[in-house]
C-alpha cells in the first residue's frame, strides 16, 4: 500500500495501490505535471485513475502515458482527451538519473500518487521500480498475513 502523505494540506487525487504489490520500489521522486484547465477542474472533482499508467523518457522529456482523467462536464468547447499523454516536469539532472535507471534491465517508472500540494498545484510521485515475480508477490502477501496475525495475537494477549 502506498504511504499516505502526512501533511493535511495535501489532497490525494489518485493512488496506485497495486504498484507496491506488483513492483519493488527502489526510490521515488516528486514531479510536476502539465495539465489543461479542464483537466485540473476534473481532478478536483475526482474519479481519475493512474493504476494502468506508466512514465517513459522519450526525446529528452518525461511523459505520463495512459493516465485517466475524466471529462469535465462544464467545459463546453475546450474538453480534454481523457487518456492523452501528459508531460511530467523534472529537472535535467533528475531526468538524466531517471533515464539511466530505466536503461537497467527490468526497471520502469511507475506513478504512485497524484495529489495537490499545499499551494494547490498538481504533483505526481513517481517510483523507480522493478517488476516482481509471482513467487515474490506470494512472499509479500505471506509477510503481510503474518504481520496481521502477530498484531492480532498481541492485541488478544494484552
UniProtKB/Swiss-Prot annotation:
Coiled-coil residue spans: none
Molecular-function annotations in GO: RNA binding
Chief subcellular location: cytoplasm
Keywords: Cytoplasm, RNA-binding
Bias kind Basic and acidic residues: ranges: 136-158
Residue segments, region Disordered: 133-158
A GO CC term assigned to this protein in UniProt: cytosol
Location of the protein in the cell: Cytoplasm
GO biological-process terms attached to the record: trans-translation
Role description: Required for rescue of stalled ribosomes mediated by trans-translation. Binds to transfer-messenger RNA (tmRNA), required for stable association of tmRNA with ribosomes. tmRNA and SmpB together mimic tRNA shape, replacing the anticodon stem-loop with SmpB. tmRNA is encoded by the ssrA gene; the 2 termini fold to resemble tRNA(Ala) and it encodes a 'tag peptide', a short internal open reading frame. During trans-translation Ala-aminoacylated tmRNA acts like a tRNA, entering the A-site of stalled ribosomes, displacing the stalled mRNA.
UniProt family annotation: Belongs to the SmpB family.
Protein name as annotated: SsrA-binding protein
Organism field: Ruegeria pomeroyi (strain ATCC 700808 / DSM 15171 / DSS-3) (Silicibacter pomeroyi)
Amino acid at each position: 500500500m502506498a504511504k499516505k502523505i502526512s501533511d493535511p494540506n495535501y489532497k490525494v487525487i489518485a493512488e496506485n495501490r497495486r504498484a507496491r504489490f506488483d513492483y519493488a520500489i527502489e526510490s521515488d521522486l516528486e514531479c510536476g505535471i502539465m495539465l489543461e484547465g479542464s483537466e485540473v477542474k476534473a481532478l478536483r472533482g475526482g474519479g481519475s485513475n493512474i493504476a494502468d499508467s506508466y512514465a517513459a523518457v522519450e526525446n529528452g522529456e518525461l511523459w505520463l502515458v495512459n493516465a485517466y482523467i475524466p471529462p469535465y462536464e462544464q467545459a463546453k468547447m475546450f474538453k480534454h482527451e481523457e487518456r492523452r499523454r501528459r508531460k511530467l516536469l523534472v529537472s535535467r539532472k533528475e531526468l538524466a538519473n531517471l533515464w539511466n535507471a530505466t536503461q537497467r534491465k527490468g526497471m520502469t517508472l511507475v506513478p504512485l500518487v497524484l495529489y495537490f500540494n499545499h499551494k494547490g498545484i498538481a504533483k505526481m510521485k513517481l517510483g523507480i521500480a522493478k517488476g516482481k515475480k509471482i513467487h515474490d508477490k506470494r512472499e509479500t502477501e505471506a509477510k503481510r498475513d503474518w504481520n496481521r496475525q502477530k498484531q492480532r495475537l498481541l492485541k488478544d494477549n494484552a
